[in-house]
Regions:
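HIT superfamily nucleotide-processing domains
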Residues: 1-98
Length: 98
């Protein structure tokens, strides 16, 4: 799915375009399920080259996951979350939203 508004990353989209994505993406996911018969899927959206964005505009991939070996595979190492650091980051995010 590609939004009508041209933007390189998700954070650069207007609130209106983001709201439109929120309305359309679930409908598109339902269509993918119906078309493929696969009920499990990943929605992927990358922002920036370091995050594996290969095309320089916001777009979403809906990737059916028919079984453990097909579809998107995610293999990043899990690390315990430091509660103090998490609280600090949450506070900074909350402040940035104001």
């Amino acid at each position: 799915m590609v939004p009508k508004e041209a933007a390189r990353t998700l954070d650069a989209l207007s609130d209106e375009s983001a709201a439109a994505i929120g309305r359309v993406l679930p409908r598109l996911c339902r269509a993918v399920i119906e078309a493929t018969g696969v009920e499990e899927y990943n929605v992927l959206e990358n922002n920036g080259g370091g995050a594996h964005q290969a095309v320089a505009h916001v777009h979403f991939h809906i990737i059916p996951k028919p079984n453990r070996s097909e579809g998107l595979g995610i293999g990043w190492p899990m690390h315990p979350l430091d509660p103090a650091n998490a609280a600090s980051v949450a506070e900074r995010i909350q402040a940035a939203l104001k």
